Every structure is written in structure tokens, then in C-alpha cells.
Amino acid sequence: MKKILIIGLGLIGSSIALGIKRAHPDFEILGSDRENIQEIAQKRGIIDSKVSLVEGAQKADIIILAVPIITTLELLKKLATLNLKKGLLITDTGSTKSEIVELANQLFDEDKVRFIGGHPMAGSHKSGVMAADINLFENAYYVLTQENQELRDLLKGLHAKFIILDAKEHDRVTGQVSHFPHILASALVWQSDDFSKEHPLVKHLAAGGFRDLTRIAEADSLMWTSVLLSNPEITIDRIENFKKQLDEIALKIANKDSAAIEHFFEQGKKIRQAMEIHKGALPNFYDLFISVPDEKGVVLKVLGLLEDFSITNVKINEENREDIHGQLQISFKRAEDLKEAREIIEKATDFTVV
């Protein structure tokens, strides 16, 4: 019986365990974490056995490190001192890859212990073992730093989309589309809070657009500190690049160059619409925005048209916003469902669908 050790039984580690169990019910899942977390995981059928780090590592055929980056680095050093099975496969789930992969390559002889960096690009506003979700990674990208069929097979029950990406390129790409936006979100919150000291209405008028832009500012501060410090060069490069872009648009505004300003927004709109937005580090789905009249029963009418679809979330935006796409927001897990739902609503109603 193949033994899989998962170190870290939070949302990611526990959800991976459930996915492995779905595809490989004959595998034994060992779990290492704090005693109370292990107890919960075992009672909920997420793991089969509770083990200490040393005991589990020496028994395991595959080890998954589902812990923060700084802890992953410490654990790799600890594992390198243990008597591990020859041919052991180790992988991680960290949001950056270069520092982790470089350390693993220094510590382990590939003929004895193999290391494949991993990054499941999905998450939730919930956390901890109680939030474990067998479908968390469905249709989400799962990055591997090199091809490995054994790991693909192990994780096939996650129903994720595996892509192979060099560690350095992974950090460049995620630095732009994941790490840097978290800096922007928190910076905008800081700026607005400072501005509100002289203009207190800021906090009352900050509605839809501000809320959407700054949602990720509520992410785990310790985790994101660890992420940024693990990817400093790319992060600083993206900050400097953004400063230049802000300076350029500021100059256009100062020069009252309306054509250039309009082009700035129009081009941004086109680029955004052309992007295929998938699940990222936090929940992100395929969203349909519908402008509906403020009438009784209209939401039920729309949902009735979509009764055969798997809908992830329905949100009614109550405030009137000058920048909103539609008062009703419906989220799907699959792009195909969004496309079909759009066609159904457009045929059955005169509502504007975006």
C-alpha cells in the first residue's frame, strides 16, 4: 500500500488529501500537524493515520508540504537529515517556487530523493481543516516545475489543470498577476484611510469599485509577507514598472490629452475582456453580470431559467454604482456554463447581459 504523508492539514493540505482519496482509495494518507488538527482530520475521514513528522517521513512514499513558504524551507532542511525511503518523491504547494526548488536541489540527491515544486492556484475565503473541499481545485491551474507522471497520477482526483512551468518563470508570472495585485490592494486601502482623515466621507462612499479592487487586502498577512520576501526581485521590478505607468497617465491628465486618456481606458477594457480569467490564489470564477429591473420576482425568474446549471454563487448588488456591470452577479465554475447561460437569458429576456 502506497503511503502519502501530508504535512499541514489546513484548507490546501486537507483538500488535496480528499482528492487523493477519491482517485486512490487504496492509498494510506498520513497526516502531520498539531494534535487537535490531526484529530479533526482523522474524524472527518481526511487522513487515515496521525503521525509525527519524523515517523511519517520515514514511512512515506510521497510527501506533500502544504505549509507556508518559510515553513517549507525549514521542513526541507529537517527532511534532509532523516533516513528517507530511496526514490521518495517530495512536492510542495507554495506560492513561489524558485527559492524552494533551489534549496531542495541543494539538499537532496536526485537518485535518492526527488523534488517537484507544485502550486495549486486555488483557494477560499475559508481556512483550516474544517474548510476542506474535495472540489476546491476543480478546473483550477496546478503548476508543476517539471513533468512527473507519478505526481500527475497521484493528484488526478483533484480534477485540476496541470501545467509545467519553470520555477523562475512561475515566479515572474505569479509576481505580476498574483503577488503584485495584493500590494496594490493594500496600498489603496492605506491611501484611502490616510485621505479619510481630512475627508471622512471617503469611508462612506467607498462602494462597489473600491470594494472589488481591495477585496484581497483581507488576505492572510503572514502568508503574503512570506510570499513577497520569497520573490523580492520580481516584486520590486513590478512596482517600479507600475510607477512608470502611473507617471505616464498622470502626464496625459496634466496635458488634458483626452484622446490618450480614452485610449488608456479603452485598451485596458479590450485587454481585460480578452483575458481568460481562471481560478487564482483566492476564489475566482466565471462571472455573469445581468442588469435587471428593480421588480419583485425578477431574480427568481433568472434563476428559474438557469435551474439546470451548477451555480457557484449569486450576488445581488444593492447599491447604485456608476461603474457596475449589472445588479445581479451569477458565478459559474465552468466557462461553458457561463456561455450557455448567457445565451439562454438573452433569448428569454430583454435584460442586458455582460
From Swiss-Prot:
Q: Which residues form the ACT domain?
A: 287-354
Alphabetically sorted, this entry's keywords are: Amino-acid biosynthesis, Aromatic amino acid biosynthesis, NAD, Oxidoreductase, Tyrosine biosynthesis
User: Where, in this chain's numbering, is NAD(+) bound?
Assistant: 3-33
Query: Which biological pathway?
Result: Amino-acid biosynthesis; L-tyrosine biosynthesis; (4-hydroxyphenyl)pyruvate from prephenate (NAD(+) route): step 1/1
Q: Which reaction does it catalyse?
A: prephenate + NAD(+) = 3-(4-hydroxyphenyl)pyruvate + CO2 + NADH
Start and end residues of each Prephenate/arogenate dehydrogenase domain: 2-283
One GO MF annotation is:
prephenate dehydrogenase (NAD+) activity
Q: Which InterPro entries match?
A: 6-PGluconate_DH-like_C_sf, ACT_dom, NAD(P)-bd_dom_sf, PDH_C, PDH_N, Preph/Arog_dehydrog, Prephen_DH
**What SUPFAM superfamilies does the entry give?**
6-phosphogluconate dehydrogenase C-terminal domain-like (SSF48179), NAD(P)-binding Rossmann-fold domains (SSF51735)
Q: Name the top EC class.
A: oxidoreductase
Which terms does the UniProt entry file under GO BP?
tyrosine biosynthetic process
Q: What is its EC number?
A: 1.3.1.12
What family does the database annotate?
Belongs to the prephenate/arogenate dehydrogenase family.
**Name of the protein this chain belongs to:** Prephenate dehydrogenase
Q: Which organism is it from?
A: Lactococcus lactis subsp. lactis (strain IL1403)
